From Swiss-Prot:
Localization annotation: Microsome membrane; Endoplasmic reticulum membrane; Nucleus envelope
Keywords: Coiled coil, Endoplasmic reticulum, Leucine-rich repeat, Membrane, Microsome, Nucleus, Repeat, Signal-anchor, Transmembrane, Transmembrane helix
UniProt repeat feature LRR, residue ranges: 10-31, 40-61, 63-84, 86-107
Name of the gene this protein is made from: LRRC59
Record's protein name: Leucine-rich repeat-containing protein 59
Function: Required for nuclear import of FGF1.
Residue ranges, compositional bias (Basic and acidic residues): 187-256
Cross-referenced Pfam families: LRR_8 (PF13855)
Originating species: Gallus gallus (Chicken)
Residues in coiled coil: 181-254
Cytoplasmic topological domain: 1-282
Annotated region described as Disordered, given as residue ranges: 186-275
Gene Ontology CC annotation, any one: endoplasmic reticulum membrane
Length: 339
């Protein structure tokens, strides 16, 4: 099979005014890049080729007004086929199409040829449900001619499309099919909105549940913290009470021990008095020793002529004389007492 993709120069050779005839060329692919370079070619005939599908970039050929894809092997149209908004005439005769993309509803149409009640009767849908797609919203829209004959269409779509045996039927087919696709698009939009709303509500519910859980967790932590604080306070009070009790017990035992110790030993004041007497006696002995040493120095050494020693010797002699007088007086008293 021949492949599309010849140079734009070779396509220009087939261009006749605004019509480009690529029928019966054995094409298995559409030369989209070369076609995009010929925006003047608003009428394109690709019939009687071996096309199985159309590339997604085919939808960029928005300058097309009339498109003939009849007698190929197309199994589906690109998802964005509705981007061909300038399209007024579309021939899809004798392909292998089962459904049409939802974007097909964007191909636009003019309702001057058929009222909404036609689709209402075909689909068994109350016309009030189709009022949303009003004449006002479509009055300047484009697609006017459509042929879907000899395709294994979905039964509902086949019933909507009907026959295309003459100009009038093909125009009515365009109206009916686009209305049908508009309804499907609206239903999908509503379903999408419903799912989106459900997801939002579910998200809000999850957020509310999360906030509730967080609030419960905060309350639980707060309660646990308060309980822990109360437990520690009780432990502190218990330890403090035990410490005070131990101090009281220790103090009591100390008092009792002191009482027992004081009752089992002699009184301390006499002991202190005896020690004081010894200290006084030692002091007196030390003074007496000093006096004797001084007398010895003043009597036996060359210092006896010094003024200090002279005074000491004089005092010594006076004391000795006084003692002797005292002994004489004492002897006299003893004698008198014996008589």
């Amino acid at each position: 099979m021949a492949r599309g993709g010849g140079k734009s120069g070779s396509l220009k050779d087939k261009l006749d005014g605004n019509e480009l005839d690529l029928s019966l060329c054995g094409l298995s692919e559409v030369p989209v890049r070369e076609l995009a370079a010929l925006p003047k070619a608003t009428v394109l005939d690709l019939s009687c080729n071996s096309l199985v599908s159309l590339p997604s970039d085919f939808c960029s050929l928005t300058h097309l007004v009339k498109l003939d894809l009849s007698k190929n092997r197309l199994q589906q149209l690109p998802v964005d086929f509705g981007r061909l908004v300038s399209l007024q005439h579309l021939d899809l005769l004798n392909n292998r199409l089962v459904t049409l993309p939802v974007s097909f509803a964007q191909l636009k149409l003019s309702l001057h040829h058929s009222p909404v009640e036609i689709l209402s009767r075909l689909l068994g849908t109350p016309s009030s449900l189709l009022v949303f797609h009003s004449f006002h919203s479509w009055e300047n829209q484009n697609l006017k001619w459509l042929d879907l004959k000899d395709n294994p269409l979905d039964p509902v779509l086949a019933k909507v499309a009907g026959d295309c045996l003459d100009e009038k039927q093909c125009k009515q087919a365009a109206v009916r099919v686009l209305q049908h696709m508009k309804v499907i698009q609206s239903e999908q939009d509503r379903e999408r909105q419903r799912k989106l709303q459900a997801e939002r509500e579910m998200e809000k519910k999850r957020e509310a549940e999360q906030r509730a859980r967080e609030a419960q967790e905060r309350e639980l932590r707060k309660r646990e913290k308060a309980e822990e604080k109360e437990r520690r306070r009780r432990e502190y009070d218990a330890q403090r009470a035990a410490k005070q009790e131990m101090e009281k017990k220790t103090k009591k035992e100390t008092v009792q021990t002191r009482k027992l110790a004081s009752s089992s030993r002699p009184p301390q004041p006499a002991r202190h008095k005896h020690s004081w007497s010894r200290s006084v006696l030692r002091a007196l002995l030390l003074v007496l020793l000093c006096i004797l040493c001084t007398l010895a120095v003043c009597k036996l050494t060359e210092l006896q002529h010094q003024p200090l020693c002279v005074s000491v010797n004089t005092l010594y002699e006076d004391v000795v004389a006084a003692v002797q007088n005292h002994k004489t007086l004492q002897n006299m008293l003893q004698q008198n007492s014996q008589q």
